[in-house]
Amino acid sequence: MYRKLFFALVVIALCLLCAVSSLAQTTTLTPAERENALKNLQATHDAFLQSISGLSEKQWKFKPAPDRWSVAEVSEHITVTESAIFGMLQKQVMTSPAAPEKRAEVAGKDEKILQIVPDRSHKAQAPEFLQPTGRWANRADTTNAFEAARRTTMDYVRTTNDDLRDHFGPHPLLGPLDGYLWILLISAHSERHTKQIEEVKADPNFPKD
């Protein structure tokens, strides 16, 4: 009887060890990481919508120069890029093999992404597939598309248990980024181009109404 009890206890102990080991290997966002990502997504959502609020058709389409984007074009770029980054995160980054050994390569990049990307003194050329082509007819349609894209991003961040820190994808300028950094890049990119919208609005030839 004691032998059976002993073996039963051993089996239970092994099961508990396996369960603990499994939990230890499962990593997801910490509460602080989730809160930080959502805070930045919400802040840049609000700032962008505020920057385009109340613009007339003339203001919406005004170009400071032939080779510079209008508010409409910048807004389209923000929206298209968000959808592209989120799609790549889902279809490429998170389907790549987990590589926790790469974590050291991206250590400290959280704050760098949020500081460097919005800095308009660093110039970069958007790839052709992310450039504006007039995908939406007006400000309302563009706004609706942006709202839908941002809602998808924020819903994912709010609810996901994906292992965002152990899956990586290369960025042509920023190097390897884990899944969480790609999320931060969405908000940092929005901030960068919201600043660009403010530059357009500050142009001396920007329509008064």
Task: Specify the residue positions occupied by each region the protein language model found.
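Bacterial N-terminal signal peptides
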Residues: 8-19
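Post-signal-peptide N-terminal segment of Sec-exported extracytoplasmic proteins
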Residues: 55-57
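Short N-terminal segments immediately surrounding and downstream of signal-peptide cleavage
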Residues: 26-44
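Positively charged n-region of N-terminal signal peptides that target proteins for export
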Residues: 1-5
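Boundary at the C-terminal end of the N-terminal hydrophobic targeting segment
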Residues: 22-24
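Short, contiguous alpha-helical
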Residues: 62-111, 116, 151, 155-159, ...
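Acidic/histidine-rich alpha-helical segments that form the ligand environment
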Residues: 40, 109-164
